[in-house]
Amino acid sequence: MKKLNVIICGLVLAATVLPAAAQTTDTRESYQERYERMVQKGGASGLGIETLLNRWLADYPDDADALLGKFLYYYSKSQSSQVVAKEQKKFLGQEPVLSLADSLGKVSYYFEELFYDEALFSRALREADKMIRTYPDRIDLRFYKIAALTGYEKENPDQAVAELRGLIDYNAMQHPEWTHPEYQVTDDFFVAAIQEYCVTFYRYGTPASHEAFRVLAQRMLDYYPDNIIFLNDMGSYYFAVKKDEKSALKYYSRVLKLKKDDNTAIRSCILMYRTSKNVKQEKKYLEMMAKYGESESDRKSSQVRLDYLNGKK
């Protein structure tokens, strides 16, 4: 009888212990490792990803990687790709994947374009807002949302620009202690990140994207009036987009007062005056490039052109 009681007690103990053991919470690291393996195999919205993320967030509701994963899940799931025909030779700054001419010689250009499911994309934005509220000074999380908006809006990046302007204002007025999982966030890092979007919008080549380029460059100059990068951007806007040499020269001249050997401004002035056939002014900036050119090739080619204009052989 005593032996039977021992066995029964052992079974009761096992019944109380085993369920607890089965419910042991996985570590953050184990969730992260499993997530990375699954993403590598099937992408951010692959099979089983949503279930894993739900379990991860149930155990660790504020885990930054899990919150990011949830955003990426819905963003990826919202996307579908199609090859579409367009009349222009470039779309969003990209070359076509294929071009075909019909029997009359009319050429159509085919581009791979992403399209978005509205409901899923809206859910992705809600997840983005949640992770930003939880980690307001994780600058990479803000850029994830902005990148999503940029992809979604394509050549009319109104919401993306609004987010970027808000980010610029927040950075300048609140001076947050930005963090990033991979990089130290310095002033140069922030400037480079904003400039990357300026370049993207400029390359899109549409009226709306060019305006976005101007708005961002001007906003940065509102806070950093002597920033050479954005002064050059404004010069490029007036020269290449608006065909306004007078306004462009104002910005390039400001750059060269701050940095007399700035090759971007010098090269732009050479091109501007060569285009307008103003030989006198072109020679002025060729002399500067021959002296301050960053490469030997720049210096030599400028001198060759200068000699030609001066009638030398």
Positions of PLM-derived features:
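Short coil turns that delineate tetratricopeptide repeat
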Residues: 61-62, 133-137, 172-173, 222-226, ...
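Terminal, low-structured helical/coil segments at or just beyond the last alpha-helical repeat
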Residues: 203, 207-215, 219-228, 275-313
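N-terminal leader/linker segments that initiate helical-solenoid repeat arrays
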Residues: 21-111, 313
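Helix-start (N-cap) detector for alpha-helical repeat units in TPR-like alpha-solenoids
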Residues: 28-31, 64-65, 139-140, 191, ...
